[in-house]
Every structure is written in structure tokens, then in C-alpha cells.
Amino acid sequence: MTAVVRLSIAPVRSLGLEHPDEIDLTPLGVVEDRRFYLVDELGRLVDRLVVGRLVQVAAHTDPGGETLRLAFPDGSVVEGTVSLGDAIETALHGRTAVGHLVLGPWADALEAIAGRRVRLVRTDQPGGTRQGNPASLVSRSSVAELARHAGVEAVDARRFRMLIELDGSAPHEEDAWVGRRIAVGDAILRVTERDARCAITTQDPDSGQRDLDTLRTIIAYRGLMPDATGAPKAMFGVLAAVEQPGRVRPGDRVEVLAG
């Protein structure tokens, strides 16, 4: 039986993951997921491709994005009610995110770990920084298969920052779900495509240091596969659209539906 074993969200894009006991999936994804993100002084996205150690900061927000708590690796905490400043548009991997600058102490606190001037943004539309299909899934058996080909004892699935982590399926069985509908908890998803991976997966999910060439290994045993535009990519896990909103919890079964 294939079932959900872990849920992961990032209230601030590229910062540490949270593992909630349940999520409410909407057509835009999970409203708390990637609700905030960082930009530089020119309004350009600052993520873990730029500063890997951002992952060392833990973040928490409420569904409305009205409060924000950041916990830093030195034990310090910055938290409070979110106040918004000027509107801002940000280029996010071929899309444009619309949001407002966040006033208050968070950006200054993040500068120390980022090593550069950054500004914090709250997106105007929950789920607005997700790439098209807001639900992402990967199985533990797929991650174990990657570890086998990489010649390491284990690979931490958090490298892939997937919303839904599964167990009980064969390695890369989720690939066969592309074009199919699946029931996950109370939600129904349509799996639309494999997930094209980037260099963030080469970073340790706790430190942000590059320590494993995941992309080379994926390409070596799976080859390059075309993305939605036909460009060859290293694919790992799948993306899905939310056809029926619903609640998802660890332990929920995953069922491939007819039609």
C-alpha cells in the first residue's frame, strides 16, 4: 500500500522546511507554503542557489501570512506581526510574482546569514511562488534507488523539498502516474509531469553545503528527459495539479484512480 509518510512546506522560500501534521491542499497548493521570499536590492530573487546556508533558518507563519517567526542556528528568534510596505514584482523562473515588501526586523536578521543585503517579500497570492503545479510527490523507494546508484548509504529526501513524501511503492513508480488522477487523503490530484531538478538538490538539507552530485547520478542512471518545453532535464519525482481540494495527513493512502 502506498501511503503518505511526510509532508514538507517552506513558509519562506529556500529557508528550512516544516513538517506539518496535516495540510489543506487548494488549487494553488498549501497557502502557508512559500508565502514569503527574499530579494536583493535590485529586486532579484535570492534563493539557495545564491546562498545555500539560508536553509539553516527555520520559519513559521499562519495561513494568512499575518505573523512570521524565524529561528536562527545561533538560537536567536525574530518574530512578530507582519506589516507591508511597497508593492514589488519579482521574476521567478520565467514567471512574475506580485507581492509587497515586509517591514520590520526580519530582513536585517537574515542579512547576517545571507552575507548580503536582502529584503523580505510576502506574495499577494498564496501559492503564488509555486511553479504551475503546486503539489509535488516523491517516494522513499525512489530516493533509496538514487542512493544505491550514488554509492552512498542513504540520501535525505529533504534535498528535493517535495510537498508529499510517499512509501510503499516501487522505485520511480510515481513516473507512471503522469497523466493519471490520484486520490491522496481527501484531495484528488492530476499528475501532470516529472519534476525537473536543479543544483539545490546537491546541497545538504541541514547545512546548505554542496556534498552530493545528485544531478550527475540522476542523469547517469535515468538519462535526460524532456520537460514541458522539450528541454532535456534531470527528472526526479512528479508534479501535480489539485483537482479536488482536501486535507492530507501522514498515513493517508494514495490510490491511482480510473480515468
Put a short name on every predicted segment:
Residues M1-G259:
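Metal-cofactor-dependent catalytic cores
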